[in-house]
Amino acid sequence: MVTRSRCTEDEYAAEMKFLLQRLPVDPSACEGVIVCSVVPRLTGVLAAACKRLTGREALVVNYTLDTGLTFAVDEPAKVGRDRIADAAAAAEHYPLPCMTVDLGTATTYNVISNKSAFLGGFIVPGVQTSLRAISAGTAQLPPIAPEPPEHLIGANTVAALNNGAMFGTAAMLDGLADRVEAELGQPLTVVATGGLAPYIMPCCKRKIIYDADLLFKGLALIWERNGK
């Protein structure tokens, strides 16, 4: 479901109803609702739409909930809700310390200590965001859709753009993981999620665990701890 800032509560409720009907799921049968929004002005709208559709008050993800984590960062209230969910899932399901990598609009890295403390991480432009920016900001570089690279060195402009994005992201992932591991002084588990993760992982030198459902596992965990 695409986030549109001008949509109303009613419009979101109608769209959610349509999506649930396709599954099919009866909205009135929902036991609970959890909202993980990184668009603050829409959080209340989405929560209200969920209540209108299901009759249930939505649980909104934030750092004050029981997530299984402690937050060793300067401003925990400003940590993205999606990052909280990813980190909560990693702390529950994977050996610690752990670094999660979510390859979305932004590529977000979250570091969780061996005591389940959220230590912070890194945020960089996502692969597709970077490719769009370089095309928009130059005269001769075309827009491209990222694809799994066939070779390391790009033999034409499109391949050079694609391989730069793929192998560049992989090199950054490997390099950051090595540095975090050295700083923590312990073996680091690295878990990747997001639609482009399967494209990036084969380009990495490190062992990377792929978990397509990491975010949803985190939301389920937070709901189990707080929503019932």
Q: What name fits each language-model region?
A:
Residues 21, 25, 51, 55-56, ...:
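Generic secondary-structure signature for well-ordered alpha-helical cores
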Residues 109, 199-203:
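Short active-site-adjacent structural elements
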Residues 48, 56-60, 65-137, 166-179, ...:
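Phosphate-binding/catalytic loop of phosphoryl-transfer enzymes
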Residues 34, 98-102, 191:
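Short glycine-aspartate micro-motif
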Residues 1-24, 115-143, 147-151:
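Short glycine-rich, Thr/Ser-proximal phosphate-binding strand/loop in the N-terminal lobe
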Residues 1-65:
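N-terminal glycine/serine-rich phosphate-binding loop of ATP-dependent small-molecule kinases
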Residues 84, 139, 166, 198, ...:
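Glycine-rich phosphate-binding/hydrolytic loop that grips phosphoryl groups
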Residues 5, 149-189, 196, 207-209:
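Adenine-nucleotide phosphate-binding core of ATP-dependent small-molecule kinases
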